A protein has these predicted regions:
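Active-site catalytic microenvironments in core metabolic enzymes, especially phosphate/sugar-handling
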Residues: 1-160
Length: 160
């Protein structure tokens, strides 16, 4: 399908300090490089099928189970915010309002302006933060056909 898939580790998803520490900063540099060289990248926050490594990490580190769905969007927001601050010239799809909220909170002084409906249930917005602009597609987490990502990528990445 042409996507580069990056699966986050439990530590990357749940450790609030990860991306401000040495390993996290190095990971962000590598991710920047991947995004700069590839038109289609997915950040996957799911555990491998049949594995609940994120929950095990949370238990081992004293993180309440109720914190998991809060910390994952915050981590995604940190990653996306970092890419926007670096000036990544791309469009992003965020599934679920929690992910979008995590990104906006991380960016601090950000403005999200709806541009229009890309497809039914998918909103295209302009995200501006510290003079950096990018386009963001948002949709509810459970909405859409199985081919949604590839169909969108085909439309967005098609030469004009």
């Amino acid at each position: 399908n042409g996507f580069v898939r990056i699966r986050l580790t439990p530590e990357q998803k749940l450790n609030k300090e990860y991306f401000s520490e040495k390993d996290g900063k190095e990971w962000l540099d590598k991710f920047w490089d991947i995004c700069s060289r590839n038109a289609k990248v997915i950040i996957d926050t799911n555990d491998p099928e049949g594995d609940n490594e994120t929950e095990r990490f949370a238990i081992a580190n004293g993180i309440p189970k109720s914190e998991i769905p809060v910390r994952i969007p915050a981590s995604l927001g940190c990653i996306i915010g970092n890419m926007v601050k670096r000036g990544l010239n791309s469009s992003m799809l965020m599934t679920g309002g929690d992910t979008l909220l995590g990104c906006i909170r991380n960016l601090g002084n950000a403005q999200l302006t709806p541009v229009g409906e890309f497809e039914i249930g998918i909103v295209l917005s302009k995200l501006i933060s510290d003079n950096n602009k990018t386009h963001v597609f948002t949709k509810s987490g459970g909405f859409g056909e199985e081919t949604l990502l590839t169909d969108m990528a085909d439309k967005i990445c098609r030469p004009a």
